[in-house]
């Protein structure tokens, strides 16, 4: 840069700033596109970390069940006798939360509740 006059030095600095600006704009728009990509795949586990008999022991027995339903992470059960429910055993099995009313309970287990519901329905109605 020793042989360049002031006009050439200014032009080099100006072109450097323009090039840097183009790179910044390119990377910010690319990052914005990547951040707007949505995950369209729902991850549901089919691995149940306890046996079905252990679960039946926690709710009294298999015969205590009236109805079972589930969302992704919550198991909703209707029982004949709510007094047979053992909250402490359910927590040992991995329940993160338990909500009760007169005959229905909602148990938050995790992403395997849909699989657990299907197993219980197969066991009850087969």
Swiss-Prot record:
Record's subcellular location: Membrane
Keyword NADP: no
Keywords carried by this UniProt record: Membrane, Phosphoprotein, Phosphotransferase system, Transferase, Transmembrane, Transmembrane helix
A molecular function GO annotation: protein-N(PI)-phosphohistidine-sugar phosphotransferase activity
EC number: 2.7.1.-
Protein name per Swiss-Prot or TrEMBL: Putative phosphotransferase enzyme IIB component UU178
Source organism of the structure: Ureaplasma parvum serovar 3 (strain ATCC 700970)
Biological-process GO terms, alphabetical: phosphoenolpyruvate-dependent sugar phosphotransferase system
Highest taxon in the source lineage: Bacteria
Transmembrane parts of this sequence: 11-31
